[in-house]
């Protein structure tokens, strides 16, 4: 049974005290401003570039990465790092081309963008869509995976106690507003990175000790052991499997390819996942929307630079767990692939385990707080103020935002209490990507055409949203029955349940392409220049010398990584 020594508990409590104290200090320092809705929801103009970058990472790297991506590292290997490394390139695109348009047009929420560019109907529909997605997919999965992981480390049956504890910690930070979230995220990221790298270092030492019999254990030798013991786990591009191979190895290859369909994913859903997540997502863009352009750009690029190194923290422990499991060194391993990270943490010595749990908790709490604040922002600014109480003053809006945070957390706890959504069965990381992917194609099509093509109309946007959603359902449930298992658009593969399945990233790619064609066709029936289109000029996209240097460094490192692991 996993238990925590006194020193581990002291380290964990010390982390909690630091975050709570610092958050309260920030709250008290800006207490007079917190009553202003813009400050509560956006921390308008007060976050530095490094705070923006840290907050982006803290909000992004949570249980679905620590637990879910580590699980995919156990199952698939380094190929899952595509989500992190393509994100680095995506953040460059967002910083250079998306953010200038948002800031010039004073966009504070994503539904507001849709109202400004299209119409009220599109904005309202998407506000409701996002609220459901954030509460029932994101909040629930983060809370469930985090509680499962920490419960496994504590030993015993404390799952529901941990859930409530995580909720209360997130509430403590969230109720202080975006400024408190932004600056406490700096501490969260510091703990996350220090604890994450310490965990990886110790995990590699454990591999050397357990597999090679080394007394002290070397992290470098441990890493070399991972490569020699699991070479297939260090390939970025998975080979296309064969549907006729009925062996266990053949089935495993198909199951991996369904999750990450080789080179094809780079021409399909991988870009949609990243560009939609980082550029059209209130939860993420909110960190930069209250800042000046240069500050926002540097913060986003700083986050992109950090993303290059995140697979080391979130993926290598999963591969280490796979090698140990393969060699019979994880006899008590349970929980499927999502149990990989907890299995590694259980090996850590006294003291390090407390630091690792603090890092994991930091990631979970920061992400819960950020997501809850985004839910409150969308509901308060885009639904409550517009439709329920148009005369609401600043204090009333902040009060409503705090109430929304509380209610959303309670709903998330209710649905994760008995895992009503089946998150554990899907695997946490895949659960989020798959079900977010049902609306991503339509949403991203609306944004990309709305930003950069002046003829796009509100009618086309609504049609695109509906088309993207319907097509996602069609490809997931009906395409195989109508078009068969293989055609020019896709190849379906036998999954572990014995049914044919199209890789969801391929589904997303085709849903997006057809949605764009639909929107363009409808827009051609409208005016040549939509009066609601944004004015764009080349000067908006010029970057400073320091910004350009950071972009070049990031691109060089990214290229080197792909050359090494292709």
Protein language model annotation of sequence segments:
Residues 1-566:
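Membrane-embedded helix-loop-helix hairpins and adjacent transmembrane boundary segments
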């Amino acid at each position: 049974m996993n238990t925590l020594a006194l020193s581990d508990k002291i380290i964990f409590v010390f982390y909690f005290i630091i975050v709570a104290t610092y958050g309260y200090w920030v709250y008290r320092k800006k207490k007079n401003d917190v009553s202003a809705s813009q400050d509560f929801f956006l921390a308008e103009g007060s976050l530095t570039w490094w705070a923006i970058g840290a907050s982006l990472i803290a909000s992004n790297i949570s249980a679905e990465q620590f637990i879910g991506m580590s699980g995919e590292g156990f199952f698939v290997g380094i190929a899952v790092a595509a989500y992190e490394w393509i994100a680095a390139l995506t953040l460059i695109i967002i910083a250079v081309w998306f953010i200038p348009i948002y800031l010039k047009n004073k966009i504070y929420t994503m539904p507001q963008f849709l109202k400004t560019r299209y119409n009220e109907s599109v904005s309202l529909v998407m506000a409701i869509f996002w609220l459901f997605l954030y509460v029932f997919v994101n909040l629930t999965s983060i809370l469930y995976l985090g509680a499962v992981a920490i419960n496994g480390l504590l030993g015993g049956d404390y799952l529901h106690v941990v859930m409530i504890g995580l909720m209360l910690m997130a509430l403590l930070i969230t109720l202080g507003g975006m400024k408190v979230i932004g600056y406490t995220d700096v501490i969260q990221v510091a703990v996350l990175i220090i604890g994450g790298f310490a965990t990886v270092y110790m995990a590699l030492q454990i591999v050397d000790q357990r597999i090679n019999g080394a007394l002290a254990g070397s992290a470098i030798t441990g890493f070399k052991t991972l490569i020699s013991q699991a070479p297939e786990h260090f390939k970025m591009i998975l080979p296309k499997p064969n549907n006729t191979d009925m062996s266990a190895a053949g089935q495993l290859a198909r199951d991996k390819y369904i999750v990450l369909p080789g080179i094809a994913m780079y021409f399909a859903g991988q870009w949609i996942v990243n560009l939609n997540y980082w550029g059209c997502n209130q939860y993420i863009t909110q960190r930069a929307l209250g800042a000046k352009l240069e500050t926002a750009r540097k913060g986003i690029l700083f986050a992109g630079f950090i993303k290059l190194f995140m697979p080391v923290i979130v993926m290598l422990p999963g591969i280490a767990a796979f090698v140990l499991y393969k060699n019979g060194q994880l006899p008590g391993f349970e929980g499927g692939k999502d149990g990989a990270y907890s299995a590694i943490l259980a090996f850590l010595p006294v003291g390090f385990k407390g630091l690792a749990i603090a890092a994991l908790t930091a990631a979970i709490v920061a992400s819960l707080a950020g997501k809850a604040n985004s839910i409150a922002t969308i509901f308060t600014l885009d639904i409550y103020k517009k439709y329920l109480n148009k005369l609401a003053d600043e204090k009333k809006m902040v009060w409503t935002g705090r109430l929304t945070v509380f209610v959303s957390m309670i709903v998330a706890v209710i649905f994760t209490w008995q895992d009503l959504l089946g998150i554990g069965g899907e695997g946490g990381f895949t659960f989020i990507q798959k079900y977010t992917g049902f609306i991503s194609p339509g949403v991203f099509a609306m944004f990309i055409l709305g930003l950069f093509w002046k003829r796009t109309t509100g009618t086309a946007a609504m049609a695109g949203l509906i088309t993207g959603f319907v097509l996602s359902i069609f490809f997931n449930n009906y395409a195989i029955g109508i078009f068969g298992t293989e055609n020019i658009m896709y190849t379906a593969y036998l999954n572990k349940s014995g049914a044919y399945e199209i890789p969801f990233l391929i589904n997303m790619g085709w849903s997006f392409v057809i949605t764009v064609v639909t929107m363009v066709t409808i827009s051609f029936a409208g005016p040549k220049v939509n009066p609601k289109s944004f004015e764009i000029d080349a000067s908006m996209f010029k970057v400073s010398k320091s910004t350009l240097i950071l972009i070049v460094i990031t691109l060089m490192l990214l290229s080197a990584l792909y050359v090494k692991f292709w």
